[in-house]
C-alpha cells in the first residue's frame, strides 16, 4: 500500500484498517528495506583492467632489401583457420616493402591469434625470398610454469593456493588460452585481501611461456563511519553509520563484514561472511540482520494514537559465481534463500498489529560492459527473480488477510555512465523497476522516495507492489576535489494489483492507484584523502499526488515540504 497522508483524527481512529495503520508510518518491513540500501554490497561487479602484460616480440632489424610479396606460407599454425590467416595477410600481397615491414605482417597474425583466444609468437625467420613467397613462423605458446613472487614478504594467502587459481584452469605444457588465463587472474585478484600483478615471460623451453605472479596482501580491514540525515522522520532523521570489513581473516580468501545504522528510534545491524568454495570463483555466503525500532517525536505515543514499535530479523544463505570475466565485460550469477521475521506492535497497549515471516528464494544476474563510444562509458544491468511465501505468526493471526501468501516478483535495473568531457563531465542515466504477480507486503514493495530514489520526497514515500523509476544526473568536476551535480528523478508506482483492494483503501491516500513522483535538484561533493562530504537539495515537480481530505499535499513524514535537503559526511579507513 502506498504511503498515506496524515488524515483527520477520524482516520486515526480507524484501528481496524490494518493496511491504513501501516501506510501512515513506515513499519519494520519498510524501514528495513530502506536501511538495507545503505549497507555496502560485497558482491559488486569489478572494474577490470588489462590483467596480462604481454612482451612485444623482437622486431626484425631494418635493412635496405625490399621484397615484392606474392604470397605467404605460415609454418607451425595448429589453432587458427588458415583462411583467416591468409585474409589477415591480404593487405601486403602485391606490395614491394622493406624487410622490416614483414614483421608488421607477422604482428598482425599474432593479433589474430589473440582474437581467437590464443597466444603465439609469430616471426620472420631468416630466408631467401626468390619467388615472392614469404615464410612466417608461428610458435604457439604453451604454459611452462607459474612463478609466484611475494615482493612485500610472506602473504596471508599461500603461494600454493594462489598458484592453483591459475593451474586449475590452465594446465602446464598445454597451449595457452588467453581468455582462461585472464579469467583466472581476474578471479584471483578479486579474492578478498589479495592483490596481484602479472607478467608473461619466456619459458625455459622453446615455445613455452611462464606466468609470473606478484602476490601481495591488501589491508586486513577497511571501513567507514558516516553521519547523514537519511533516516525516516518517524524513527529519527539523523543517522550514524558504521561499516567494517575484514578481508581474508582466515587466510583462504574469506570475508567478514559488520554494519550498524543507528538513529534516535531505530537500531539496525547486519553481519555477513563469505568464502570461496573452489578456484573458479564460486563463493558461499551467510548473512543475518536485526532491526529494532520505535516511533519518536510527533510519531510517538501519546502524540500519535497509532504510534508503534517492533523488530525485523533476517537470516540467509547466498551463492555467487562469476559467469564472465574479461577486460571489457563481466557477468555475475547469484542465488539465495532468506527467512525474514517481522513484528509490529501498538505503542499504546503493546498488542500486535502484525506478526509474520517471509521465506524467499532469489535468483539473479548482473553485468557490466565497458566501451569507448563518445569518450568511453559503462553499461550496467541486473535482473532478480524472487519467489516468496508469507507465514502469519500467532501474535496477530488475522494480519492483513487481503495480501496473498505466495508471490513472485522481478526486479530490473539498467544504467549508462557516459563520459561527456573526459575526466570533467559525466552523464549517468539509470532506470529500475519491479513487477509483481500479486499485491505485496511492505517488506517487498517498490519505493520511490528517499536519497536513493526520487530525492524530492522522503524515504518510503511512493510505495506500491509495482513501479519504475528513472534517475538522470550530470556530474561536473569543478576543481581537484569538488564535484557539482544536477539531477532529475521520476518514478511511477502502482499501489495495488487488485483493483478491488485499491477501491477499499482509496480513502487512505486520496491518490490514484497509479501515480507519479518527480523532482529536480543539485548537489556538491568534496572528496579529501579520507573524508567525503556531500549535500544535495531536490524540489518536487508538479503537485503531490497524496493529499488530505482538504486537498493539501502531505508526505508520509507529516510534512508538506516542496524541497528536501540531503547531507552526508563519511570517514573511510
Predicted regions mapped to residue ranges:
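Hydrophobic, lipid-facing positions within transmembrane beta-strands of outer-membrane proteins
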Residues: 240-244, 267-271, 313-317, 359-365, ...
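Outer-membrane beta-barrel proteins
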Residues: 246-250, 272-279, 292, 318-326, ...
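Periplasmic polypeptide-binding modules associated with outer-membrane biogenesis and secretion
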Residues: 24-231, 259-268, 430-433
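Outer-membrane beta-barrel "beta-signal"
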Residues: 244, 524-532, 557-573
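Transmembrane beta-strand segments that form the barrel wall of outer-membrane beta-barrel proteins
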Residues: 222-231, 242, 246, 252-263, ...
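Transmembrane beta-strands of outer-membrane beta-barrel proteins
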Residues: 223-225, 254-258, 282-286, 331-335, ...
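C-terminal outer-membrane beta-barrel translocator/porin domains of Gram-negative envelope proteins
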Residues: 345-509
Amino acid at each position: 500500500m502506498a504511503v498515506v497522508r496524515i488524515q483527520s483524527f477520524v482516520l486515526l481512529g480507524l484501528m481496524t484498517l490494518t493496511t491504513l495503520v501501516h501506510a501512515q508510518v513506515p513499519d519494520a518491513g519498510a524501514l528495513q528495506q530502506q536501511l538495507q540500501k545503505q549497507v555496502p554490497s560485497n558482491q559488486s561487479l569489478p572494474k577490470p583492467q588489462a590483467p596480462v602484460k604481454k612482451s612485444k616480440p623482437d622486431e626484425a632489424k631494418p635493412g635496405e632489401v625490399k621484397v615484392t610479396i606474392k604470397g605467404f606460407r605460415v609454418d607451425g599454425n595448429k589453432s587458427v583457420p588458415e583462411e583467416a590467416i591468409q585474409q589477415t595477410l591480404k593487405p601486403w600481397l602485391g606490395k614491394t616493402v622493406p624487410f622490416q615491414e614483414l614483421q608488421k605482417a607477422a604482428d598482425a597474425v599474432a593479433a589474430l591469434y589473440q582474437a581467437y583466444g590464443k597466444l603465439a609468437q609469430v616471426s620472420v625467420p631468416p630466408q631467401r625470398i626468390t619467388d615472392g613467397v614469404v615464410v612466417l613462423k608461428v610458435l604457439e605458446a604453451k604454459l611452462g610454469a607459474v612463478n609466484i613472487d611475494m615482493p612485500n614478504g610472506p602473504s596471508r594467502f599461500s603461494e600454493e593456493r594462489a598458484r592453483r587459481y591459475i593451474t586449475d584452469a590452465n594446465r602446464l605444457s598445454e597451449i595457452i588460452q588467453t581468455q582462461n588465463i585472464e579469467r583466472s587472474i581476474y578471479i584471483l585478484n578479486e579474492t578478498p585481501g589479495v592483490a596481484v600483478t602479472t607478467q608473461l615471460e619466456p619459458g625455459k623451453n622453446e615455445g613455452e611461456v611462464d606466468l609470473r605472479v606478484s602476490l601481495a596482501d591488501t589491508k586486513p580491514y577497511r571501513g567507514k563511519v558516516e553521519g547523514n540525515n537519511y533516516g525516516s522522520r518517524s524513527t529519527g532523521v539523523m543517522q550514524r553509520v558504521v561499516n567494517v570489513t575484514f578481508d581474508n581473516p582466515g587466510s583462504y580468501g574469506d570475508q567478514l563484514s559488520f554494519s550498524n545504522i543507528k538513529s534516535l528510534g531505530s537500531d539496525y545491524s547486519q553481519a555477513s561472511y563469505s568464502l570461496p568454495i573452489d578456484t573458479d570463483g564460486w563463493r558461499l555466503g551467510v548473512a543475518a540482520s536485526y532491526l529494532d525500532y520505535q516511533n519518536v517525536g510527533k510519531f510517538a505515543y501519546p502524540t500519535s494514537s497509532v504510534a508503534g514499535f517492533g523488530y525485523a530479523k533476517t537470516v540467509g544463505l547466498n551463492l555467487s559465481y562469476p559467469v564472465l570475466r574479461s577486460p571489457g565485460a563481466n557477468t555475475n550469477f547469484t542465488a539465495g534463500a532468506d527467512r525474514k521475521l517481522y513484528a509490529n506492535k501498538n505503542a499504546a497497549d503493546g498488542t500486535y498489529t502484525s506478526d509474520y515471516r517471509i521465506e524467499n528464494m532469489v535468483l539473479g544476474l548482473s553485468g557490466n560492459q565497458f566501451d569507448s563510444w563518445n569518450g568511453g562509458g559503462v553499461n550496467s544491468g541486473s535482473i532478480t527473480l524472487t519467489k516468496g511465501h508469507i507465514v502469519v505468526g500467532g501474535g496477530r493471526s488475522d494480519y492483513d488477510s487481503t495480501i496473498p501468501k505466495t508471490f513472485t516478483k522481478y526486479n530490473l535495473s539498467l544504467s549508462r555512465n557516459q563520459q561527456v568531457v573526459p575526466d570533467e563531465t559525466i552523464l549517468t542515466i539509470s532506470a529500475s523497476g519491479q513487477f509483481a504477480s500479486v499485491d505485496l507486503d511492505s517488506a517487498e514493495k517498490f519505493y520511490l522516495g528517499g536519497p536513493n530514489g526520487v530525492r524530492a520526497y522522503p524515504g518510503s514515500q511512493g510505495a506500491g507492489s509495482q513501479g519504475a523509476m528513472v534517475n538522470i544526473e550530470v556530474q561536473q568536476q569543478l576543481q581537484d576535489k569538488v564535484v557539482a551535480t544536477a539531477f532529475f528523478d521520476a518514478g511511477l508506482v502502482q499501489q495495488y494489483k487488485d483493483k478491488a483492494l485499491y477501491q477499499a483503501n482509496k480513502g487512505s491516500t486520496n491518490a490514484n492507484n497509479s501515480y507519479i513522483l518527480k523532482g529536480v535538484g543539485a548537489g556538491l561533493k568534496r572528496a579529501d584523502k579520507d573524508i567525503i562530504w556531500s549535500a544535495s537539495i531536490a524540489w518536487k515537480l508538479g503537485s503531490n499526488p497524496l493529499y488530505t481530505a482538504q486537498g493539501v499535499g502531505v508526505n508520509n513524514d507529516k510534512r508538506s515540504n516542496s524541497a528536501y535537503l540531503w547531507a552526508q559526511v563519511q570517514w573511510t579507513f
